[in-house]
Structures are given as structure tokens and as C-alpha cells.
Amino acid sequence: MIQGPKPDLQSPSLALPKDMSSREIDQFLTCGRVGRLGMILPEGGPYIVPVGYGYGDGKIYFHTCSEGLKMEILQANPNVCFEVDESISDCSLAKSVIIFGRAEIIADKKEMIPYLEKLIDKYRVPVTFGEYMKKGNRDVQEELEQVRVGLITPHKITGQKFVRKNGNF
């Protein structure tokens, strides 16, 4: 067992957990860069993978390949958990949002494109999706065949922040 000094519970720098408001959660999810998608393997074990994501209209969206372990898992069991966090300094100041929901896979190109455009904009890809399509990239249609968009509809969202006793994050 690891032992160390006991925390000074009276210290003004001690970070205490506090629930985030709906507004704080929305702002945090909008600004987040990487989320962790938690799923259950067909044999019952956990599987978690980091993904770039977007957030809008109360839903999480991400792009993925049309084939692979993630797709196999989501097709077998669409119930997911999605987590985004941020920490400052020594991790004593942190924020974390956890979403419990159901993932839907979008394969229709017309439905996927608005989500892909938002992801391109968020991650500052130097060309818009429309420009990419117009450039005559011969592989673009093949690439679209290999891409899917995952859309998570939450049924529960929790958010916590660890703040110092003086209220600072």
C-alpha cells in the first residue's frame, strides 16, 4: 500500500468536488478536443478508445471507419459511455463530464456531411469538406464509403469540477 502525507483538509488550496451546471457542461463539451468512448466487448469486457468529437443539439458526434473493432462493438451493443476531462497543474483542479447514452451509426453520405463539416471546422483542417469534394480528389468517394459518423444521444449526463475552497477552478 502506498502511503504519503495526509491531506490538510483545512487547506485553502484543497480541491473539492462540485456539480457542474447544465450551462457549464454545454460549454465544456463544446470546447473539448478529445473524448473517450467506452463500450462493452461482445465477451463482456470493457473497451475504451479516444476520439475527436463534436457537440451540438445535446448530442455527441464523431467519425469512425466503416469497419473495425469499434464498429463491431457498436453494432452489437449501442449502449455507450462518453467522457471528456481537463486538468490543470497537478490534477488537483479538474473538470469531467460523463455521458451515458446510445450510439447510432450514420452511413448515409448526405446525413454524414454536415457532421463531417463541423468536425473539419472544429479541428481547423485547412480546407472545407465541400472544397475537398470539388478538388477532384479521385479517392474521395472511396474514402466516404469507408467513413461513418457516430451520433450519441444521451440519456444521462453528469459533470463535476474540482474547485479550491475559495471557488477558483
Kindly give the residue locations of the regions a language model identified:
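A generic structural signal for nonpolar/aromatic side chains embedded in well-ordered alpha-helices
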Residues: 29, 73-74, 119
